[in-house]
Design a protein with these regions (language model features):
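Intrinsically disordered, low-complexity terminal regions enriched in charged/polar residues
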Residues: 1-222, 226-229, 233-238, 245
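Conserved kinase catalytic-core helix
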Residues: 237-268
């Protein structure tokens, strides 16, 4: 995200990402208008002739009006009990790039492994509003061409000094095998958008690597993780019994899956 700060006849350009901010030297936009002009030109002329402006995410797009009508009919047919306002469906739904690569069996084998597209239904289920953070957003999605199941998609900016989520799912898989994962979502795939094979990427932070000391530990990469099934917020349960059963399942997932695999969950 870019911000232009104007202070009398002087200006500075600020470039924010999920790890920090890069600030230009102050320049006089009256006597040296070429700096501001070049910035604005480059802003709307990204490299590689990609659409949009510099920093825009080309892996997430708005559906067309025809796609909205088609996907609305598909979602209503496959998930008639799903409650979502028609206006929010039309306004907030998105197409997003994901990766389908389940670790274990019991999944839809008709979905080709690798990068694919999913349809995010309506507004996010949960969203972090902090700028300098993982900025986690959780969507409810269906896989394009395989809309009979709902999945949870977590979009976040992971610190590169930390292990990816698939590491922990693989560890649980090693200890649990093909047995039932009680109280724990199943890993369906992960897409590291910041893995540019050594090339600069708009899905990697830049400010952290410019710091001295341990600044590189704050470097982040844009990751999307797909899991199944989709959970419910505690506030949406219709009875105390239903809520208690949900809490019990979460505790079982912690004890039988994480602790038995020698994994300690940080928030706990």
């Amino acid at each position: 995200m870019f911000v232009l700060g104007v202070y009398g006849h002087d200006a500075r350009i600020y470039r924010f990402d999920r790890s920090g901010v890069i600030v230009s030297k102050a320049f006089n936009y009256i006597s040296s208008p070429e700096y501001l002009g070049e910035f604005l030109w480059r802003l709307v002329h990204p490299e590689n002739s990609s659409p949009g402006i510099i920093g825009s995410d080309t892996t997430i797009t708005r559906p067309t009006s025809k796609e909205i009508e088609r996907m609305l009919a598909i979602v209503q047919r496959h998930h008639p009990t799903l409650e979502i306002e028609d206006a929010k469906f039309r306004q907030d739904s998105r197409w997003m790039d994901v990766c389908w690569s389940p670790l274990c069996g019991g999944h839809d084998s008709s979905v080709p492994r690798g990068r694919t597209r999913c349809f995010a239904i309506g507004p996010p289920l949960w969203q972090s509003t902090n700028l300098f953070s993982r900025a986690t957003v959780v969507w409810r999605v269906v896989i394009k061409g395989h809309e009979d199941k709902l999945y949870a998609l977590k979009d976040s900016w992971r610190e590169l000094c930390r292990n990816p989520e698939v590491f922990f799912y693989e560890r649980i898989q090693k200890f649990k095998g093909e047995s039932e994962w009680v109280g724990l979502a199943k890993f369906m795939g992960s897409l590291n958008l910041g893995d540019g094979q050594g090339k600069p990427s708009r899905h990697r932070t830049s400010s952290a690597t410019l710091r001295t000391g341990e600044g590189s530990l704050q470097d982040r990469s844009h990751v999307r993780t797909l899991t199944y099934p989709v959970g419910h917020q505690l506030s949406t349960f219709t009875s105390t019994r239903q809520m208690v059963l949900g809490l019990r399942a979460a505790i079982e997932g912690l004890v039988f899956n994480l602790w038995s695999s020698n994994i300690i969950l940080k928030p706990l």
